[in-house]
Amino acid sequence: MEKNKPISVAFEDIRNNPDFIEHSEYRFINDDLGMVISFQAMGFRLFRTQQPYRAKEGRIVRIMQGKGRISINLIEYEATAHDIIIIPDNSLIEISEVSPYYEFQVIMPTANFLPVLQNSILSEAYTRNGIRLSCNNEEWAHISSFFSLLWNILHCLPYRRGAVQHLIVSLLYNLKYIHEHTCKSTPARLSRQEELFRRFIALVNQHSKHERNVNFYADKLCLTPHYLSSVIRETSGQTVMQWINQAVILEAKVLLKHSNLLVFQISDELNFPNPSFFSKFFKRMTGMTPAEYQKQT
């Protein structure tokens, strides 16, 4: 029997999803981008709670109502109405919980549609962990206008590619302004320890598939292993190894659910010495074997 295939959030998989194709009045998708104006109205669950996903393309998410908790590259955010979430390319995403009638809109440009993004619009914070913006009423009204105008232009014939491209760039410049203004007006800045923690998490997201030694991360940050361990525990309440193991488990879950790799291939992909070692590690961390996890719907 063919196993239940989970929903992937890569652009091409979403584009070919039959539920997504069916609800054309609430979504737009072409070779350049996808946009959804109401996930509630589309009537299907693209995302499941407690299920990690690998998002190949970046997203601009506009929270319309309700509240939820989302982890982006191991950093957890609470996302409520009037929030904007900017998710970087190739992110690990996990939604831990959402309230009833949670509603959001999404703009999802393909990687080549806005090549200027990484270098000149968004900050380093975006490329590492994403950004959550809590907007005031005026900022929210401006962003609403961008979303509405983009939605209308997307449905003009012929397709106005340049207008769409520059409108999204303008939206991102506006979001950058809001982000920078918020940082300047908020007295509380990240402490050195918190900044080290963010840098450590970025390294874990980048290297945990192959590097699980405290010394490696300490060397990358020009710190002693003892000092790094102390800072991470003091800042986050978890040890260096707990964060590394958490990243490995998230990656393993994504591969188990969203790839055709067999368990022994996933073991190799994640640099375990053998499949038995990987299976024991996975069960110790999750309470179930990799095969049992794959069978979950």
Where are these regions (language model features)?
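Generic protein-terminus/edge-of-domain signal
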Residues: 1-67, 77
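Short acidic-glycine-tyrosine-enriched beta hairpin
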Residues: 74-88
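Terminal helix-turn-helix DNA-binding modules in bacterial transcription factors
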Residues: 234-276, 295-297
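Short beta-strand His + acidic residue motifs that chelate non-heme Fe in jelly-roll/DSBH
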Residues: 69-71, 87, 93-98
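Short hydrophobic/aromatic patch on the recognition helix
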Residues: 82, 228, 277-278, 282
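A hydrophobic/aromatic-rich effector-binding and dimerization subdomain
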Residues: 2-7, 20-29, 96-152, 181
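Short, Lys/Arg-enriched, Trp-marked, Pro/Gly-tolerant hinge/linker segments that flank
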Residues: 134, 157-162, 175-202, 206-221, ...
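…primarily DNA-binding HTH/wHTH and HhH modules…
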Residues: 280-297
